[in-house]
């Protein structure tokens, strides 16, 4: 019988102080014993490691999910399942989500605690490196939170399994559901509000867009980051103009807000559909499905589809599991401060099932007399489907890659007896990848009795409906007469179209939509301004590429670089595409013709299909002139050349070897692909991502980029310093293939490896006093007694690496080694001891990353500061959208507005007031007054045009149109300004009362930006003159309005107008005008009309 700890509880914390920096971390050894009767055999003891942060603020905190382990043991004790003579011990030490500390904890658990399996890690910072180390040490790793996504290829972690279904699975369910229901046009709406703790938006958003973009028409994609109901409502209103089927990617709290906004907008009529995606959350939507708390459903829920796992809320014992975990967490040793079941992490259920699955697998292997301590054999048993489990999270069955498959259901409000409930409507089989009706008698209660259409009958813009022709007596005769003619034309057209299609097929021109899935719409990429990025240099705009400085594709569409005389590097434009940061490499407009070639299209498709961790991901190309460009993943650290150049100290040997490994692995993949070789290998084409992993770029698409697959190195415009890494046999050719040769890649690797050894950022021949043209001439000279090569010092690195470099740059291509043998040599030259390598690498990585960030910050601080000054100044002069267009280098076209309302005001007696005041006092007076005005108008939908002296000009209805609200907005604002003016006190003349006179007029105007130096947003038209006349003919403390404004206010209702009479207006003759006296319910006092004035006027 396995021994217990000293207390009566089977779970007791044991605190100890570890070595070094872990002395102050809470450590916990969870002693969980399965006590079984033993006859003659000695009990087997298995110690299992557990990795999760202690801090309760973390969503994967031990204090939120740790008791999931104890519940497993309680079940095994109370419900024996024949696990034999085994006792279990779980050890835990806080690693605070630090990759370095997690490594130390894991190594300590393996070497001292002799753990047989690891559950975790729960933090993404440590997942990849611990997964690799666990695979190296043959220790099974159970990922219960889905952090092993970085190791997508199970080859890299062949002892890992993941119990959380991948988010790509729910995207596939959504895709098949939309196909089944026949909905082709969709909108995507969602985000994360300030008070929402949902952290899956980015990952889920990317998975959904990746799964839908090539199969459906995404008419709108809107994200929010605010909890403002007004903003949500405005975004949903805009979405409703172009989409009837709306996919919501958000938390359950935000989903309820959005559905309420739909009710407020009148979108609950049954014409709109809201599809909610649910992966792990247990709050509101679980209550909906389990009918726990929701009794009555609002009408809008009849328009809701919910996609969730089929076992969502229905696992064995699920009803009481969260309650049990919550109770255990509040007891020792966890002593969690959680106060309700809602604070228990839903991942505790996956932790529970992971441990139970491991226990059952151990027992199955014991029965089969297999070594359950062999991690690979144990994981192979799981991947073979030999062990299944009906757990808290539903059926647990793993595929051959160690990933869990979960069936999903589509839930809808259906009739069940005499009430409506959310019940399964469709069922998705994750193994067969098909979707079927849940049952034949399901009766979904849509408001209009049938499934809604994905678009209105006449289209969103009424463009699908035509006016019906008049029905006259002779119409039938006319139509009948033209039927033969129309029939002939239709048949002739069909024959012509058929012939054209056959001709195109014979010419092998690929034209069906499936052949252009790699095309990216340029407007689907959001270009990021510099201050939002943390990379060195400045993005090069499309317009700047053709200036007088030398432009080169340093990474051949991996990272466009622009060189100036001071050798400062400027990176390619960076944008956001489908949630990914991407780099854009612009190609000449002549590529529009090249991309139509079948060979180019096939190669673009091939580039999209190349997937390897050491290859820069290729997203596609934009083919719309003048923005023809190649879109690849953005690598934050720049190129290998930048890493070497910006390093103030010698790069550690472990990093150099790591970079060399990455290059070799990438080239091995390329040489085994249809591309066969790289052809342009050099430091600027070796990009480094934020994880310091090297990825190759700059290969392929030669015909698309240059119009030919051949190139000449003898052109005068060639930058010879870029040819240092090109093999001499290729340099000697009059025309050589752009893709190079495998032997040429070996030579390029040798020069590149020598650059790494010597860490020379300015080329391998920087210590040779000769022009680049001369160096290239000497390299390709076949008669040279000793071929020219860069200097190579023996003491700079391992002797085997130096010898490898010499072999790889051999003059004879046939004598150069191949990359499999190069990889073997690198492995043999690597230091021994995996623990020390990984520990050292993590420490160096943190130091190196911090150093690079300091360099980035230092080099960009001044540029960012200057740019902010310009943007701030521009925002005070022009409307925001005008400023954005000017910054983007676009011209701002004048715009005609059919109806706006303009406000003019000035100060009565301002000239006399100025004569009694000093210039400084006048400036202070105007600043105080117009600062008060500026603050007041912020609560109205108006735009301040300008101030000239004591004149103040405001307009509504532009630059953003607001329908018929402009007169209402200006009138209410004028009343507020008149009210605040009566209480305004002049600083240097407190006894004086400031008197404002105001004029309003409504009519059409033209607005535009005038000038290049100090540009202004100006208004033109007779409406401006008339508004000025209304102000100049007004009286003190009065609002003078024209007849057109009065009509608009009467239509709006609630305003008190008084007829002034007929006055003479310059240039307009006699005009009937009015006084604006007030408004119903206006909350602040206004100056009163005198009785004498009232006698003259007639109240309407």
UniProtKB/Swiss-Prot annotation:
> Sorted alphabetically, which Gene3D superfamilies does this protein's record hold?
3.40.50.2300, 6.10.250.780, Nucleotide cyclase, Transferase(Phosphotransferase) domain 1
Parts of the chain that traverse the membrane: 482-502
Q: Does the keyword Transmembrane feature in the UniProt annotation?
A: yes
Q: Is Iron-sulfur there in the keyword field?
A: no
Q: What is its EC number?
A: 4.6.1.2
Modification(s) after translation: N-glycosylated.
Tissue-wise expression: Highly expressed in testis.
Q: Which GO terms describe its molecular function?
A: ATP binding; GTP binding; guanylate cyclase activity; protein kinase activity
What InterPro entries does this protein map onto?
A: A/G_cyclase, A/G_cyclase_CS, ANF_lig-bd_rcpt, ANPR/GUC, Cyclic_nucleotide_synthase, Kinase-like_dom_sf, Nucleotide_cyclase, Peripla_BP_I
Please name the taxonomic classification of the source: Eukaryota, Metazoa, Chordata, Craniata, Vertebrata
Q: Where is the signal peptide?
A: 1-43
Major localization class: membrane
The name this protein carries in UniProt is Guanylate cyclase 2G
Q: Which species does this protein come from?
A: Mus musculus (Mouse)
PROSITE patterns according to UniProt? GUANYLATE_CYCLASE_1, GUANYLATE_CYCLASE_2, PROTEIN_KINASE_DOM
SUPFAM superfamilies named in the record = Nucleotide cyclase, Periplasmic binding protein-like I, Protein kinase-like (PK-like)
Catalysed reaction(s) here are: GTP = 3',5'-cyclic GMP + diphosphate
Question: Which compartments is it annotated to reside in?
Answer: Cell membrane
- Looking at the UniProt record for this protein, which Gene Ontology cellular component terms does it annotate, in alphabetical order? external side of plasma membrane; membrane
Tell me any Pfam family this protein matches: PK_Tyr_Ser-Thr
Q: Which family does it belong to?
A: Belongs to the adenylyl cyclase class-4/guanylyl cyclase family.
Q: Topological domain, Cytoplasmic: which ranges?
A: 503-1100
UniProt membrane topology term: Single-pass type I membrane protein
């Amino acid at each position: 019988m396995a021994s217990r700890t000293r207390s009566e509880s089977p779970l007791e914390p044991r605190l100890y102080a570890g070595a070094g920096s872990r002395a102050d971390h809470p450590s916990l050894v969870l002693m969980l014993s399965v006590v079984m009767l033993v006859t003659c055999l000695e009990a087997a003891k298995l110690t299992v490691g557990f990795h999760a942060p202690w801090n309760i603020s973390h969503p994967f905190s031990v204090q939120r999910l740790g008791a999931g382990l104890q519940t497993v043991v309680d079940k095994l004790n109370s419900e024996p399942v024949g696990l034999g003579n085994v006792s279990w011990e779980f050890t835990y030490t806080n690693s605070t989500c630090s990759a370095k500390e997690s490594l130390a904890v894991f190594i300590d658990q393996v070497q001292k605690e002799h753990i047989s399996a690891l559950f975790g890690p729960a933090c993404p910072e440590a997942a990849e490196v611990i997964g690799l180390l666990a695979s190296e040490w043959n220790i099974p790793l159970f990922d219960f939170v889905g952090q092993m996504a970085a190791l997508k290829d199970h080859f890299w972690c062949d002892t890992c399994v993941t119990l959380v279904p991948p988010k790509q699975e729910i995207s596939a369910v959504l895709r098949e559901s939309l196909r089944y229901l026949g909905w082709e046009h969709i909108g995507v709406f969602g985000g994360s509000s300030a008070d929402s703790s949902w952290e899956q938006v980015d990952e889920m958003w990317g998975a959904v867009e990746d799964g839908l973009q090539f199969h459906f028409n995404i008419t709108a994609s809107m994200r929010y980051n605010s909890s403002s109901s007004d903003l949500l409502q405005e975004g949903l209103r805009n979405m409703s103009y172009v989409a009837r089927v709306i996919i919501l990617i958000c938390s359950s709290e935000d989903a309820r807000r959005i559905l309420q906004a739909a009710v407020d907008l009148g979108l609950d009529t049954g014409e709109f559909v809201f599809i909610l995606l649910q992966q792990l959350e247990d709050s509101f939507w679980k209550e909906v499905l389990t009918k726990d708390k929701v009794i009555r459903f609002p009408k809008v829920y009849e328009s809701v589809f919910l996609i969730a796992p089929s076992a969502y809320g229905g696992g064995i014992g699920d009803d009481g599991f969260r309650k049990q975990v919550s109770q255990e967490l509040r007891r020792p040793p966890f002593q969690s401060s959680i106060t309700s079941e809602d604070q228990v992490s839903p991942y505790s259920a996956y932790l529970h099932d992971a441990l139970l699955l491991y226990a059952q697998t151990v027992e199955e292997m014991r029965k089969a007399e297999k070594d359950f301590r062999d991690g690979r054999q144990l994981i192979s048993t799981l991947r073979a489907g030999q062990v299944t489990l009906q757990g808290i999270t539903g059926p647990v069955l793993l595929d051959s890659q160690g990933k869990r498959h979960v069936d999903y259901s589509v839930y809808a409000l259906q009739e069940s007896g005499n009430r409506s409930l959310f019940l399964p409507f469709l069922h998705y089989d994750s193994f067969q990848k098909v979707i079927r009706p849940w049952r034949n008698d399901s009766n979904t209660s849509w408001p209009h009795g049938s499934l809604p259409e994905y678009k209105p009958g006449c289209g969103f813009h009424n463009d699908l409906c035509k006016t019906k022709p008049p029905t006259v007596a002779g119409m039938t005769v006319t139509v009948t007469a033209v039927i033969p003619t129309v029939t002939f034309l239709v048949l002739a057209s069909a024959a012509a179209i058929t012939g054209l299609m056959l001709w195109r097929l014979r010419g092998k021109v690929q034209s069906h939509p499936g052949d252009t899935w790699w095309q990216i719409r340029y407007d689907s990429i959001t270009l990021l301004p510099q201050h939002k990025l943390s990379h060195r240099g400045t993005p090069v705009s499309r317009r700047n590429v053709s200036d007088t400085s030398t432009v080169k594709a340093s990474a051949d569409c991996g990272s466009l670089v622009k060189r100036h005389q001071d050798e400062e590097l400027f990176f390619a434009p960076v944008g956001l595409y489908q949630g990914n940061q991407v780099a854009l490499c612009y190609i000449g407009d002549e590529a529009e013709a090249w991309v139509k070639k079948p060979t180019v299209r096939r190669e673009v498709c091939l580039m999209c299909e190349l997937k390897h961790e050491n290859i820069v991901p290729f997203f596609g190309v934009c083919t719309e002139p003048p923005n023809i460009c190649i879109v690849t993943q953005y690598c934050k650290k720049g190129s290998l050349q930048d890493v070497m150049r910006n390093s103030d100290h010698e790069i550690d040997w472990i990093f150099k070897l790591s970079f060399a490994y990455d290059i070799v692995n990438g080239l091995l993949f390329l040489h085994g692909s249809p591309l066969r070789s790289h052809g342009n290998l050099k430091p600027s084409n070796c990009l480094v991502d934020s994880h310091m992993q090297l990825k190759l770029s700059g290969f392929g698409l030669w015909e698309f980029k240059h119009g030919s697959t051949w190139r000449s190195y003898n052109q005068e415009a060639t930058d010879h310093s870029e040819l240092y890494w090109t093999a001499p046999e290729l340099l000697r050719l009059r025309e050589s293939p752009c893709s190079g040769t495998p032997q040429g890649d070996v030579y390029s690797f040798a020069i590149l490896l020598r650059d790494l050894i010597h860490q020379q950022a300015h080329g391998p021949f920087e210590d040779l006093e000769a022009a680049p043209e001369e160096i290239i001439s000497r390299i390709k000279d076949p008669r040279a007694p000793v071929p020219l090569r860069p200097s190579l010092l023996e003491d700079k690195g391992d002797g085997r690496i130096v010898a490898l470099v010499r072999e790889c740059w051999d003059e004879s291509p046939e004598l150069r080694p191949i990359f499999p043998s190069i990889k073997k040599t690198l492995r043999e030259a690597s230091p021994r001891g995996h623990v020390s390598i990984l520990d050292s690498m993590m420490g160096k990585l943190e130091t190196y990353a911090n150093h690079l960030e300091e360099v980035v910050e230092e080099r960009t601080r001044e540029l960012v500061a200057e740019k902010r000054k310009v943007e701030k100044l521009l925002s005070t002069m022009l409307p925001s959208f005008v400023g954005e267009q000017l910054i983007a280098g676009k011209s701002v076209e004048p715009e005609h507005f059919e109806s706006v309302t303009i406000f003019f005001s000035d100060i009565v007696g301002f000239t006399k007031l100025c004569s009694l005041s000093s210039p400084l006092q006048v400036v202070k007076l105007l600043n105080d007054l117009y600062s008060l005005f500026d603050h007041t108008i912020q609560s109205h939908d108006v735009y301040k045009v300008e101030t000239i002296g004591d004149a103040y000009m405001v307009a509504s209805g532009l630059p953003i149109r607001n329908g018929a609200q402009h007169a209402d907005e200006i009138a209410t604002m004028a009343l507020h300004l008149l009210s605040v003016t009566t209480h305004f006190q002049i600083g240097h003349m407190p006894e004086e009362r400031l008197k404002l006179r105001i004029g309003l007029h409504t009519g059409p105007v033209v607005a535009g930006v005038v000038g290049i130096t100090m540009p202004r947003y100006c208004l033109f038209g007779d409406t401006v003159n008339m508004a000025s006349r209304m102000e100049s003919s007004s009286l003190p403390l009065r609002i003078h309005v024209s007849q057109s404004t009065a009509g608009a206010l009467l239509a709006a209702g609630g305003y008190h107008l008084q007829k002034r009479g007929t006055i003479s207006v310059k240039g307009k003759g006699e005009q009937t005008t009015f006084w604006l006296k007030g408004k119903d319910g206006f909350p602040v006092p206004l100056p009163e009309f005198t009785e004498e004035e009232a006698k003259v006027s007639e109240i309407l």
